[in-house]
Every structure is written in C-alpha cells, then in structure tokens.
Amino acid sequence: MEKKVYLVLENGQFFEGNAFGAEGEITGEIVFATAMTGYLETLTDPSYYGQIVVQTFPLIGNYGVIPADFESANTHVKAYIVREWCQEPSNFRSEGNLDTFLKERNVIGLCNIDTRQLTRIIREYGVMNARIVNSIENLDSIVSELKNYRVTDAVKNTTCHEITISKPEISKNKVVLMDFGAKKHIHKELEKRGCEVITVPAYTTYEQIMELKPDGIMLSNGAGDPADNVSIIEEIKKLLQTKIPIFGICLGHQLVALANGAKTIKLKYGHRGANQPVKDLVTGNVYITSQNHGYAVDHNTLPPSCSMRFVNANDNTCEGIDYQEIPVFTVQFHPEANGGPRDTMFLFDRFITLMGGNK
C-alpha cells in the first residue's frame, strides 16, 4: 500500500498524495517544468539544485532510466513531483524504472496529486518554498519555517573540484569550460566541433585560466541567484578584457551581464521547459528553445556597449546579448538541449567562428 504524504506550500496550502522513490521529509523551492520528455535530464541537471520539481506532463517515466541521457553523474533536485509514474517502462535502452532510480539516488518522490492545480497555484503566487512531510499536525509551524528557506551555495555544491581535459582525435581549438554546474551536452557539442575541452572549477582565477592559453572560454549553466557569485564575477571582468572569445549559457549569460554592470531580476515563476519561443532581434527569426532559469537579465540596465539579441516571445524578457566591443555573446536558453529542441545549435558554430574557425 502506498504511503500517504503531504506537500505543504509557503502560502499555507497543502496537497495530499503518495510517496514513491526515497522516503523522508524535505524542504526546497518549488518550481514546475513543462517538457513532455527529458525527465532524466531534468533530474540530473545541476541547474535544479535546491528545488522541488513538479512535472506538468501527467505520466512520467514511460521510457525508464537510461544512464546515457544523464546530464551529470548526480541528481540535484530536492524532490520530484508527478501526477503518475510509469511502473512498466518500455524502451530497449532502459535499465530500470523511475521509482527504483529515485530510491537509489535518495530523491524523495510524490505522486497522485493534482499537478495541474499545483502548477496554477505557482503561476498565480509565484515560485515559493515547500516541504514534503509525513504529517500536517503542526501545519502553522511548518509554514512559518518555510518562509526562512533560501537556496544557497548552489555553484559551490555543483561545480567540479579538479581540472579535467578531453581531446577529440583531431583538436582544432582549445576551450576552457568554467563549470558552474555544467551539463554534459555542452561539453559534447564543443568536442563534436573539434575542441579540446579543459573543464575547470567555478572558482578558478583569471591567472590560472590564462596559464592554459585558451582559444575560447565557455561559461556554463548553473543554479541559484547569479548575484551571489561575487568572486566569480570579478574574475569574469578580467577575462572580458583579454579579447578572448567568450560564449555564456544560462548562468554564464547572467554572470557576464553582471560583470558589465547590468542587473538581474527574479522571475515570478521562471522558464522551465522545452517549448519556449525566442525571437532573434537581428534576423527576425523565432526559435523554440529549452530553458531552465528563475532569474533573467534586466535589459533596461544593459550598458550602451551591449545589445539584446534574443527576446522571449511570451514575456519579452532578455534571452541573449551581443557585446559590441569584445568577441563575446551569451544566451539565457540552452542550445545544447538533449532531447531537443535543437533549433539553436548553430550558436556553437558561431563560437567556433569567433575563435578563428577550424584552424
């Protein structure tokens, strides 16, 4: 018999559901993700660090567990909420089911709740803190404690701890990848284009990076409030003065903007899913993109040397920036998205061109 558990929201509302995966109680920032596929990528994406993720698609786990699709070696979500999970997955690549996977990774799961209603609440009230508990006898006390929770040290807890180097058979460009919680497929797309990729920890200094003599620098995705990363922003300021080509994705995009004096804002409920339309303000083209972020660059604070290149077609928030005086461009969305869409993969080719093409 499935164990009864509860989801308590910071605004005092609660849901009754059933436990699956690991059992226990956990607190996190609750967000929703709208993608119909890619649940394995979601669970292993470091950008979800500290968060309780709600899947809006009603049935999750249909194609089982496929390690080759993981975005990192670890799971980073605090807990995982679905309407229903598939107990008998069907896929020739599958190595297990979702319930067993969550148990092995000690990730608490919650099922059999109205995820549609829960998503509506998050849309109306905005992202908030939540807790999965075994009892709601002390509801007022739980709600009071929730108001004090904050995701902290996200980059510190998701970055690598040592430098690693990977080379394709024919290496044409040397790229330093600053790992703020990098997804595996950023690395893959660079290597596919003939790049030697040197992955370095987030707190690597300007001087240490210069010793590696890179042709280009990639600033990865990551979790948390971008403004918290004060020391990293200072190092990026120095890197921007070198005129070495730089490509930033997601958190990397935000950190470059902050290094240029712009500001970031927290979105009401963020962009998390694989169906976000983005308009290129130069060409007029519209692309469908994969996104996972709760903060955005405030385009009204950009200095004159920057121009907004991409804008979200739903809410007009900043999705990409071109820097006019230096070989730098950044995007808020994920061109490397595994499982798709792959409309903006050409941005990796633009980065290669900035480095001088295939030498």
Name each region found by the language model.
Residues 1-207, 211-212, 226, 338, ...:
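RNA-binding accessory domains that recognize and position tRNA/RNA substrates
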Residues 174-179, 289-290, 329-333:
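Active-site-proximal beta-strand elements of phosphoester/diester hydrolases
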Residues 216, 220-288, 296, 340-350, ...:
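Cysteine-nucleophile active-site neighborhood
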